[in-house]
């Protein structure tokens, strides 16, 4: 497309490529591809509509938070540019505030997160918003601040599939299973586990799910350790080639999960690339926990 100077076709192909790179957690590559798209837009505004780029721009801004080498000042500048572009295309600031609410929750700045959630909810829903994703990320705030009952109540549209998105419903099941078990509600936890297992069927290669699997493993190590380790084997392999944020978050969740494994040793089939690899497949739980803590 570039050789034929077909800018419109090249842009469509690059937007599709960003979708594929997003599934692979290839943040740096995503950003590079989108930078080319923006350059083409600036030089060919008669061919490329800015409105067509904004959904993926939201993803790109999200990716900048995940790369430690990008200073926060630059992340904020990208956010301000995204904000300018959505406003001039007639969108509300709902998606802008939503992204900040997510990042503040991940940074455990819960007061700020709540402020952004309230600002988000005060803005109108539009085509830059995804109700299912908004609900899913809001759950993190309520679950992490100890408000399980409120989280479970708010999650009902996700649980009952009144609102859906490619992964939002599954992510809700995964974390609600863990938090319900922790809250002393094993029946709810078991229900969420069943729903999660159904949704995970056929997604054995979806490595981007790593960010959400750690707490599900923790749930299983509380209730069915063998099943938990089956998922851990898969996810540890994924963690060796994912981005920095996903590796960090998964490691944090595994430190939590391993508190519930009472055996001193476990038998695992892990890849040779794993730093603690053992040919006999026998791993010390304490050494595994130390490894994940150091990550």
What are these regions (language model features)?
Residues 1, 25-40, 66-81, 104-119, ...:
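Helix-turn-helix repeat elements of alpha-solenoid scaffolds
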Residues 1-7, 38-47, 80-91, 118-129, ...:
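Solenoid-like repeat scaffolds
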Residues 8-26, 52-65, 95-103, 136-140:
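Non-membrane alpha-helical segments in proteins
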Residues 10-12, 53-58, 88-98, 125-137, ...:
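Generic helix N-cap/helix-start motif at coil->alpha-helix transitions
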Residues 20, 102-104, 140-142, 178-179, ...:
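Residue-level signature for tetratricopeptide repeat
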Residues 107, 121-131, 140, 147-152, ...:
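Mature, well-folded catalytic/scaffold domains that follow N-terminal targeting or propeptide regions
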Residues 172-228, 233-234:
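Long, well-ordered mid-to-C-terminal structural blocks that present hydrophobic/aromatic surfaces
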Residues 207, 213-214, 218-295:
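Long, ordered, amphipathic alpha-helical scaffolds
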């Amino acid at each position: 497309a570039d050789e034929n100077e077909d800018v419109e076709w090249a842009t469509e192909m690059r937007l599709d490529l960003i979708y594929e790179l997003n599934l692979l957690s290839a943040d740096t590559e995503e950003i590079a591809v989108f930078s080319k798209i923006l350059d083409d837009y600036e030089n060919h505004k008669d061919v490329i509509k800015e409105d067509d780029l904004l959904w993926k721009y939201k993803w790109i801004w999200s990716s900048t938070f995940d790369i430690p080498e990008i200073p926060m000042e630059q992340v904020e500048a990208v956010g301000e540019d995204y904000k300018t572009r959505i406003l001039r295309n007639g969108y509300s600031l709902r998606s802008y505030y939503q992204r900040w609410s997510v990042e503040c929750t991940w940074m455990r700045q819960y007061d700020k997160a709540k402020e952004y959630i309230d600002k988000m909810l005060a803005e109108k829903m539009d085509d830059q918003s995804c109700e299912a994703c908004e609900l899913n990320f809001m759950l993190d705030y309520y679950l992490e601040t100890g408000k399980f009952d409120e989280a479970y109540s708010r999650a009902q549209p996700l649980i009952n599939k009144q609102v859906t998105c490619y992964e939002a419903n599954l992510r809700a099941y995964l974390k609600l299973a863990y938090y319900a078990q922790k809250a002393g509600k094993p029946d709810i936890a078991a229900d969420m586990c069943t729903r999660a297992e159904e949704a995970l069927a056929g997604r054995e290669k979806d490595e981007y799910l790593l960010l959400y699997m750690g707490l599900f493993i923790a749930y299983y190590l509380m209730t069915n350790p063998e099943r938990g380790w089956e998922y851990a084997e898969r996810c540890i392999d994924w963690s060796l080639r994912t981005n920095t944020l996903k590796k960090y978050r998964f490691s944090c969740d595994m430190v939590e999960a391993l508190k519930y494994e009472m055996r001193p040793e476990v038998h695992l089939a892990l890849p040779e690339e794993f730093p603690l690899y053992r040919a006999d497949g026998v791993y010390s739980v304490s050494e595994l926990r130390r490894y994940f803590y150091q990550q």
